[in-house]
């Protein structure tokens, strides 16, 4: 019988029996069969979860499998960061914010817009670990954040 996990250990301390490497999209899941060096296992969570690098699955056979963020194509953005971050956020685009750069997933439309705004952009392959959002762990699921308001997107 294939081992199963219905529990995530957030920011797991280790030690780990195996690791599973997932890209950003694959780290959003509820029910899925995953493969690691120790064999396949089934994830069966009560609700959809956004997994972060360092979270882990507690398997029914006692093993702990840590999640690692896979390297994937990203845009590394430098320039007037406050202005660039505002435009990225206005489009509800997941973004990693660092002291001297922003990191977003590759998108040719956003790349063209950011270049017009004065950004210097390089294409790299890095683990994508965007900011989690103000209203919950990991991603923001939709746009509802507990209050009503009107705003318009440019």
UniProtKB/Swiss-Prot annotation:
It is found in: Cytoplasm. GO terms for cellular component: cytoplasm. One of its GO terms (molecular function) is unfolded protein binding. GO terms for biological process: protein folding; protein-containing complex assembly; urea metabolic process. CDD domains: UreE (cd00571). This is Urease accessory protein UreE. Its main location: cytoplasm. Belongs to the UreE family. Residues 135-154 are annotated as: Disordered. Pfam families: UreE_C (PF05194), UreE_N (PF02814). Keywords: Chaperone, Cytoplasm, Nickel. SMART domains: UreE_N (SM00988). Involved in urease metallocenter assembly. Binds nickel. Probably functions as a nickel donor during metallocenter assembly.
């Amino acid at each position: 019988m294939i081992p199963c996990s219905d529990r995530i250990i957030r920011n797991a301390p280790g030690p780990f029996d195996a690791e599973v490497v997932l890209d950003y999209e694959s780290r959003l899941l509820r029910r899925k069969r995953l493969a690691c060096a120790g064999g396949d296992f089934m994830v069966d969570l009560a609700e959809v979860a956004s997994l972060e690098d360092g979270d882990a699955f507690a398997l029914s056979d006692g093993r702990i499998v840590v999640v690692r963020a896979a390297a994937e194509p990203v845009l590394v953005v430098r320039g007037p960061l406050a202005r660039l971050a505002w435009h990225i956020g206005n489009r509800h685009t997941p973004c990693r914010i660092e002291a001297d750069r922003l990191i977003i997933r590759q998108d040719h439309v956003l790349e063209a817009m950011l270049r017009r705004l004065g950004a210097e952009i390089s294409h790299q392959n890095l683990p994508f670990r965007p900011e989690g959002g103000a209203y919950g762990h990991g991603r923001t699921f939709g746009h509802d954040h507990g209050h009503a308001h009107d705003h318009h997107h440019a």
